[in-house]
Design a protein with these regions (language model features):
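Hydrophobic packing and interface segments
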Residues: 1-724
Length: 724
């Protein structure tokens, strides 16, 4: 089929994004890294980060090789899968890993330069940190769109089975991206939080030395940063939303003719492409003045993200109108509902996690009565904070569904297909400005490490005050970014849920399985619609298979969190023992005359991350396969719904509780309730330490878990049908 000329905007946007990422990277590298001591600290961190990545990619490479052989056997041996799946799976993982590598590399080069720029002014420090974060944001969208464009062109040339086959095949590279993202997020979270928790317990609580003090042997491993896995995480959300919406578009507009169907398929790709250019505009708008307050800093970032969001909303109307898609106006409002949901969730997260607002201030106040009340208050705040995001996502789902199908509540096959396409379009809308929203997220670890470098390099009080301001902002932007990632994951997972039915349809058609439609007539699977499938597989709440699947899905979220939390705990115990040993055996560390063995702590974190990440990550792959083989399609749909509902709510709770504990401690360090060294400060350090794996390991990993279970179900649909 002929690809419309307007499609080529997609690869052009990807090249522009990658070119601008390279430009921002070179601009950052031209900045001075500072004093010899600052360069030395940065080199330690860089070596630790690269050692971790090298080990992680070895482990992930083995897992990918095993899965690729399995998919090749399913495709060419059992003939229950499209023959392109093994290759799509590999490219998804490769590009996702590449995004993570560039993000980590940029972050480790940017931290010392940010600290050095902060010696000049707050604005100079903000610009370097934020534009270094933009390198990751633009790399993710650039590589994502490039991968999508290449596969669309290749499959359009070689796959003659039509757009539904092409788009569902493209979806499978999302599983490669999801697998890589989960390993990166879980492994990176265990690595950095084992070091962080260990450094806090022995350094701040026992030895009473400040955070990021060079006398603490674990401080270098801690400063490798939370950026590990962040790029890979949102890469798979971004690709998943675009690809699932393209697949839903092919299904929804299949009866309208090939040309209309093709326009519906490329619409989400074009919205994402235009989002690249508007994200760039927002990035250039971010700046601040010397002596800026936390609210001023937040406002400067909000200007960039909000301008990009407003412009993409306007651009969507033009794109859908010019494509001539039926009900273009309703679909445009679906996009706006997704964008609005992203903004509202971000603002709600900021309210519950920034120490400019009451919830976090109350946690700081609770520190006056001890660590127990800090923990209780933080858990309560995290639980209450789930209310607004859950309601917001619920409203966004309903609005995007109804706007896309013309407010048709009949649940006919046509209105259902168009409504589901609207939900997918809403997810694309939320992620269309990822270039700038991921920049604000990645900015957090860079600012954090800049503060660590300033502390370890003994820079002046004024510089440390500036890096503290950037770091506190980074905690809030990181929490806001996590809220955004969780919200987009929920919409993407729902779109993937609908795409699963399309993949089952293709698998049944390939296996020549006949079925009964709603009227009781025997028809081929190729002629069936979504209501027919729901009836055929008895997908309703009275079917015990659906209920059992839903319970397993909800349990999987808690099981996964429990395993990752325990992994951090075990690794942190080893780190605590090592730091205590060094304090005991290496003379002069606490006096500042002896040099700690930083490398040993980096080695402990690296080894723990590689060992501990395997079981939770593999579990996420195995559960949907077992449920599919035992409980069938109805059980899998229950599993995905239960995993989505439980995982989304739990992820919001963990991210917000962790962010609130962190900023409650920062609030006291700025002078509230007795300041540094006070009883309240020590109580809040305990809360912050508990919150570390909440917000940086288990919580963010849940986003990937709920999407990976959907992706695995889609890829394994042929196997599920074979066991019917």
């Amino acid at each position: 089929m002929m690809i419309p000329n307007v499609f080529w905007l997609v690869p052009i946007a990807s090249i522009v994004a990658l070119a601008m990422a390279y430009y921002f990277f070179t601009q950052m590298m031209k900045a001075d890294e500072g004093t010899p001591r600052m360069k030395e600290i940065a080199l330690y961190v860089r070596k630790g980060a690269m050692a971790y990545l090298k080990q992680q990619y070895k482990v992930v490479g083995i897992v990918f090789a095993v899965l690729c052989v399995l998919f090749a056997f399913m495709a060419y041996g059992l003939n229950v899968q499209n023959p392109w799946v093994p290759f799509a799976f590999l490219t998804g993982g490769f590009f996702s890993g590449l995004a993570g590598f560039f993000g980590m590399k940029t972050a480790t080069y940017a931290s010392a330069r940010t600290a050095n720029a902060a010696r000049e002014s707050l604005d100079a420090g903000l610009k370097i940190a934020f534009r270094s974060g933009a390198v990751m944001g633009l790399t993710v969208v650039g590589l994502g769109l490039l991968d999508i464009a290449i596969w669309f062109v290749v499959l359009n040339h070689f796959d003659a089975d039509g757009l539904i086959s092409i788009t569902t095949t493209m979806l499978t590279f999302g599983m490669g991206a999801s697998c890589q993202a989960l390993f990166a997020r879980v492994g990176g979270g265990i690595y950095t939080k084992a070091a962080d928790v260990g450094a806090d317990i022995v350094g701040k609580v026992e030895a009473d030395i400040p955070e990021d003090d060079p006398r603490n042997p674990a401080t270098i491993a801690d400063n490798v940063g939370d950026v590990a896995g962040m790029g890979a995480d949102l890469y798979e959300s971004y690709c998943g939303s675009v690809l699932s919406t393209a697949a839903l578009g092919a299904a929804a507009f299949g009866v309208a003719g090939l040309e209309v169907q093709l326009r519906a398929v490329i619409a989400p790709m074009l919205i994402a492409a235009v989002g690249v250019f508007l994200s760039l505009l927002g990035i250039f708008l971010v700046r601040t003045k010397e002596g800026a307050t936390m609210r001023d800093l937040l406002r400067s970032l909000s200007v960039g993200t909000n301008v990009s969001a407003v412009l993409i909303a306007a651009a969507t109307f033009a794109i859908l109108y010019l494509l001539g898609i039926e009900n273009w106006l309703g679909l445009s409002f679906s996009v706006i509902s997704g964008l609005a949901a992203g903004v509202i969730i971000g603002q709600a997260t900021e309210y519950y996690t920034s120490h400019s607002y009451k919830p976090t201030q109350q946690i700081s106040e609770a520190g006056q009565t001890g660590a127990a009340t800090v923990i209780i208050k933080g858990i309560g705040t995290g639980m209450i904070s789930t209310c607004i995001p859950v309601i917001t996502i619920g409203v966004a789902i309903m609005l995007s569904y109804l706007c896309a199908n013309g407010f048709d509540l009949s649940m006919s096959s046509e209105s259902l297909a168009h409504g589901l396409y609207g939900i997918g379009i809403a997810a694309v809308g939320m992620l269309s400005t990822l270039g700038i929203t991921l920049a604000t997220d990645a900015y957090g670890p860079i600012a954090d490490n800049a503060g660590g470098n300033a502390e370890m390099s003994s820079l002046g009080e004024e510089v440390r005050h500036r890096t503290d301001a950037l770091d506190a902002l980074g905690n809030t932007t990181a929490a806001t970014g996590k809220g955004f990632a969780i919200g987009s994951a929920a919409l993407t997972a729902l779109a993937l849920l609908a795409s699963y039915i399309e993949e089952i349809k293709i698998a049944m058609t390939r296996a020549n399985v006949a079925m009964e439609n709603l009227q009781g007539e025997v028809i081929s699977a190729a002629d069936a619609n979504i209501p027919d499938f729901m009836n055929f597989f008895q997908v309703n709440l009275m079917n015990p298979k659906v209920l059992v699947g839903a319970f397993i899905g909800a349990m999987a979220a808690f099981l996964f969190c429990g395993m990752t939390m325990e992994a951090v705990g075990r690794a942190a115990e080893k780190m605590v023992q090592e730091v205590r040993r060094q304090f005991r055996e290496i003379a002069g560390i606490l006096e500042g005359t002896g040099t700690p063995d930083y490398g040993r702590c980096v080695e402990i974190s690296t080894r723990a991350a590689q060992h501990e990440m395997i079981i939770p990550s593999v579990l996420a792959i195995i559960i949907p396969i077992i449920v599919g083989c035992v409980l069938g399609v109805a059980g899998v749909l229950g599993l995905l719904v239960g995993g989505l509902a439980g995982g989304f709510t739990l992820a919001v709770f963990m991210a917000n509780a962790g962010g609130a504990w962190d900023n409650a401690k920062k609030n006291i360090e700025e002078g509230a309730f007795g300041g540094k060294g006070s009883f309240a400060h020590k109580a809040c350090i305990v809360g912050d330490t508990v919150g570390d794996p909440f917000k940086d390991t288990s919580g963010p990993s849940l986003n990937i878990l709920i999407k990976l279970m959907s992706m695995v179900s889609i890829v394994m649909a042929g196997l599920t049908v074979a066991f019917m």
